[in-house]
Amino acid sequence: MLARTLVTPRLRLEATTPAHADGLWTATESSLSQLLVYMAWAPQASPENSRSYAERVAKRFDESIDWSFTVFHDDVVAGAISLMNYEAMFKVAEIGYWIRSDLAGRGLATEAARAVCDFGFDEVRLHRIELRAWVENAASIRIAEKLGFTREGLLREASWAQAGYQDMYIYGLLESDRKAAK
C-alpha cells in the first residue's frame, strides 16, 4: 500500500481526493494570471473542472496510474504536484507541479518535489523521473538543478499555453543519481 500522505518540514502532501477540490480551485484562482503563462489547462480552470480533476486523479492514484498530491502549507492549499505519464514497463514517470503565486520563491516547490521524487523511487519503485520545463521558466529550471536532475535535451515547441507553442528542456533523474547524491 502506497503512502497517501507525505510530510516534510514545512509541507503536508495529501493524495488528492474530491475533498480537496475547493481548496485547489481557491489556490488556482488566486494564481491564475501566473498559471496562464505556463499551464495549458489554466484557461479552462473553474470550480467544476477542479472537482473533475480531483475525482479523476483520485481514481488514477487508486489504480496506480498516476500519483497526484495536494500540497498544504500552514494548513492552506499551496498547490499541486504529480507523478504522471507513468510507463510501467520502463518504471518511468514525469513530475509536474505548481505553487500558488503568493507562496512562490520560498523553496516550497523544491521541498514538495524532493518528497515526491523520494516517494517515486522508494514506494512506486521508479527507475527514472522526468521533468519538463519551459526554457523561460527559470524557477522550474532551478528546481530541477537543485534536485540533481540532468538536462538531457531540448524539446522544440513541445508545450502550449497562453503564449503559444514553447520549447521545453527535458531533465532526467535516475534512482542511481539520487543514491549517489545522498
Where in the sequence are the language-model features?
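Acyl-donor (CoA/ACP) binding surface of acyl/acetyltransferases
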Residues: 1-23, 27-34, 68-182
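Short, polar/charged, Gly/Pro-enriched helix-capping and turn/loop motifs at alpha-helix termini
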Residues: 38, 42, 64-68, 127
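A short helix-loop-beta-strand connector motif used in the catalytic cores of GNAT acetyltransferases and
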Residues: 55-70
